[in-house]
Amino acid sequence: MHKDFAIIRELELAIQKKPDSLDSISHLSIPKLTDLTYIPLLYRWCREIADLDRISKKEFKRRFMFIVFFLYSPSVLAGDKRTINGIRCVLAEILDYHAPSAISNSIPSIIADYKNYADFRVAVGDMYTRVLERLEGQGIIVGI
């Protein structure tokens, strides 16, 4: 057998694992929120939570976008290019960007910051925890 044909066996194994992978992706991609009208409320809460005197406007926006994408479209933070319809427009308007494409262009660096910088992870985690408490307290989401 030609050594290049070994790829066939690798493909067979990958195809066998695919259904489990798809189930896992489907389950992990379920958003905690779907109603985009909550984004302005999330923005207000995040502004209240963040110490805006200690972080730049840019840093705040990045933390806020991470939290919004995690709540509405978590697969985006894992590299999926598809977001839920309308989220970029809402974020662009709230964050005063000229076009929704600016939101899309920010995603790779937000992902990189989360992966590479512990202080970013901690700050986002703290903000997310406090936002989640408010969401649960308001009955917007039920304990996750």
Where are these regions (language model features)?
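Short Cys/His-based metal-binding microdomains
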Residues: I111
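Short Lys/Arg-enriched helix C-cap and helix-to-coil transition segments
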Residues: Y114-E136
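Generic structural marker for isolated residues within well-ordered, non-membrane alpha-helices
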Residues: Y43, R88-C89
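Short, amphipathic alpha-helical "recognition" segments used to contact nucleic acids or chromatin
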Residues: E59-G86
